[in-house]
């Protein structure tokens, strides 16, 4: 018997419950903590970056991706946990069986904030017309101290004009 996360209605939260949780959890957002980022290794925006990337995170917006957007880097890295046999809901997202999500790398990250930002997008790319929009949730080049996210920013600047856009030139 196959179970899918969208079929587990008993574990899903209502819209009102999600809004109440978000309002409460936003009070506890980190200020300058390093959190783990899960990287899509096959995307051109992540050329030269490892699978897991430290992200400097402050009180930044929490990005969600729609159907037509790509979440290139997500908050939290999967760690094995054999005790978990079913999908679990963490606010608006689900965790697969046998996996747990590690958000904090260093610094103060309250559990409420970790749940709020878990599985959210740090870097997104979306096609719009003949171009694209690339969004960062934080500051990828903050004082030049975060070299991993600096690489993401450089890839966006250098490759963004050609990769992911419409290459045709019409007269």
What is the meaning of each model-derived region?
Residues 1-48:
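A glycine-rich, often tryptophan-bearing local segment used as a flexible ligand/cofactor-contacting loop or short
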Residues 60, 64, 77-78:
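Active-site neighborhoods of enzymes that stabilize oxyanions during catalysis
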Residues 71-73:
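General marker for long, soluble alpha-helical cores
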Residues 23, 42-44, 48-55, 66-69, ...:
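Extracellular ligand-binding/catalytic regions of CAZymes and related secreted enzymes
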């Amino acid at each position: 018997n196959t179970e899918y996360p969208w079929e587990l209605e008993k574990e899903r939260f209502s819209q009102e419950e999600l809004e109440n949780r978000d309002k409460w959890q936003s009070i506890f957002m980190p200020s300058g903590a390093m959190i783990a980022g899960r990287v899509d290794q096959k995307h051109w925006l992540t050329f030269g970056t490892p699978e897991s990337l430290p992200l400097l995170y402050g009180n930044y917006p929490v990005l969600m991706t729609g159907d037509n957007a790509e979440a290139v880097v997500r908050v939290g890295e999967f760690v094995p946990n054999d005790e978990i046999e079913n999908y679990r809901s963490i606010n608006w997202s689900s965790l697969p069986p046998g996996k747990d999500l590690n958000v904090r790398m260093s610094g103060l990250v309250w559990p409420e904030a970790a749940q709020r930002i878990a599985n959210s997008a740090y870097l997104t790319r979306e096609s719009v017309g003949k171009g694209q929009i690339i969004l960062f949730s934080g500051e990828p080049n903050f004082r030049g101290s975060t070299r991993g996210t600096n690489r993401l920013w450089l890839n966006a600047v250098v490759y963004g004009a050609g990769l992911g856009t419409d290459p045709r030139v019409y007269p």
